[in-house]
Amino acid sequence: MTQTTKRPVSYQSARFLMSAEQLQQCPPDVGVEVAFAGRSNAGKSSALNAITQNGKLAKTSKTPGRTQLINFFTLNSEGCRLVDLPGYGYAKVPKAMLEKWRSNLQRYLEHRLTLNALILVMDIRHPLSPFDCSMLDWCEARDLPTLVLLTKADKLKYGPAKTTLQEVKKELKQKWRFPVEAQLFSSVSKVGVEEAHAFMDRFFIPPDETTSDVETTEEPQA
């Protein structure tokens, strides 16, 4: 008798729930959240849209750093949410505002109990920036499972892209001691989308939720 995993969570079901500037404005701290973070212009919004198969879910902009609030998206399974964190890096805003964003981001990462995992987006052409490393340090301090998506992989040929992936994996292993892995990703070719789904499934789907012989699926919600 075969055992197959249910998928009660449909990532296509993601719908905007609310925005918050500060931790105390976030939804009640119950349920499960997987957050998306990344340097400004790394392709975070495009990655979130590709993963949910909804090109309009997270607003994309040619101006780096336009994501200024913590944006919450609800899924079709009660208490399950995706979270789009403010882009960090070189946003063209006053320094005081950048520090405010950084402080709010840090408080969310350190104190949000429902945060179960993080997807950290990096441009494959500029991985492991000082900002990325700071983010990984925060994740390590909390022992937060993290998936690094090397976005815009379609901008490189396959050979150089794989080489960069191996180099990033090596550096992650050498510098950090917590559950972190890396994956090539392209919102254009959809490389890495299934791997991102599998990573999130670990937190949204209880390991004992199996069914015999026939897998049960849900129709994606429009």
From Swiss-Prot:
Record carries keyword GTP-binding: yes
PANTHER family recorded: ENGB-TYPE G DOMAIN-CONTAINING PROTEIN (PTHR11649:SF13), MSS1/TRME-RELATED GTP-BINDING PROTEIN (PTHR11649)
Name the record gives this protein: Probable GTP-binding protein EngB
SUPFAM superfamilies in UniProt: P-loop containing nucleoside triphosphate hydrolases
Function recorded in the entry: Necessary for normal cell division and for the maintenance of normal septation.
Swiss-Prot/TrEMBL cofactor(s): Mg(2+)
MF terms (GO), sorted A to Z: GTP binding; metal ion binding
Domain EngB-type G: 30-206
Species: Hahella chejuensis (strain KCTC 2396)
Family matches, as CDD domains: YihA_EngB
HAMAP family referenced in this protein's UniProt entry, alphabetically: GTPase_EngB (MF_00321)
Residues bound to GTP: 38-45, 65-69, 84-87, 151-154, 184-187
Binding site for Mg(2+): 45, 67
Family assignment from sequence similarity: Belongs to the TRAFAC class TrmE-Era-EngA-EngB-Septin-like GTPase superfamily. EngB GTPase family.
Recorded name of the encoding gene: engB
Family matches, as InterPro entries: G_ENGB_dom, GTP-bd, GTP-bd_ribosome_bio_YsxC, P-loop_NTPase
Gene3D superfamilies the record matches: P-loop containing nucleotide triphosphate hydrolases
GO CC annotation: cytosol
Record GO biological process: division septum assembly
UniProt keywords, alphabetically: Cell cycle, Cell division, GTP-binding, Magnesium, Metal-binding, Nucleotide-binding, Septation
